[in-house]
Amino acid sequence: MKISDVRSKAFAMPLTSPAFPMGPYRFVDREFLIITYRTDPDRLREIVPEPLKVTEPLVHYEFIRMADSTGFGDYTESGQVIPVEYNGQPGGYTLAMYLDDHPPIAGGRELWGFPKKLASPTLHVNTDHILGTLDYGKVRVATGTMGYKHKELDIVEQAKRLAGPNFLLKIIPHVDGTARVCELVRYYMQDIVMKGAWTGPASLELSPHALAPVADLPVLEIVEARHLVADLTLGLGEVVYDYLAQ
């Protein structure tokens, strides 16, 4: 293969059969269970990277079911998102996500900088409630429940919340083990079509694990729970801060 061919074809690895395709990345009937809880503010400040700022001692714990996604297939994801500000702009910082499908793990890490790891999350309706779980290996590290569709939420307001900015810390090492890329990335959900939004009584239990430390941000109080269904496109990102250039 000629050098010019390598340059023109280079997108992702392996060169001749990339682990994930080029976008756009559209999700149909993407289902969320988002349980917002109050936690220890000191622990939040320890893990949220500057120039992001912690605004409230809150965490959004998310279980996301994605049965129909272009290029990524059928998978489920779970993890923690922290409300933050960047230069006065409110948004969410993704701390870690755990999922069960290689293409979105590879694509998420390489394209955007999503902090994704392989695990076994689930999200489904269990009789009268919606149930989210996360297993890391043989250990159950998260269990979330919410009464099924107890009360409708304003879908316009929920669409606005989904459309807000999201932030990621993208880290890619050089071949010598030093940081080659260390950037704060911002991205948005686009072309959102809300199909439903509900709330209800909720619970969240987090258990310690050395490699899936979701319990490091302890649940002190449940603040809000939302069950959402939407079609949306995962927009590509932009670098808002380069740690290596400063």
UniProtKB/Swiss-Prot annotation:
Q: What superkingdom heads the lineage?
A: Bacteria
The family annotation for this protein states: Belongs to the ADC family.
Q: Does the keyword tRNA-binding apply?
A: no
Name of this chain's protein: Acetoacetate decarboxylase
Keyword Lyase on this protein? yes
What is the catalytic activity of this protein?
A: acetoacetate + H(+) = acetone + CO2
| InterPro entries in alphabetical order | Acetoacetate_decarboxylase, Acetoacetate_decarboxylase_bac, ADC_dom_sf
Q: Which GO terms describe its molecular function?
A: acetoacetate decarboxylase activity
Q: What Pfam families does the record point to? A: ADC (PF06314)
Q: What does this protein do?
A: Catalyzes the conversion of acetoacetate to acetone and carbon dioxide.
This protein's species is Burkholderia multivorans (strain ATCC 17616 / 249)
- Could you tell me the EC number(s) of this protein? 4.1.1.4
**Catalytic residues?**
116
Q: Which UniProt keyword terms apply here?
A: Decarboxylase, Lyase, Schiff base
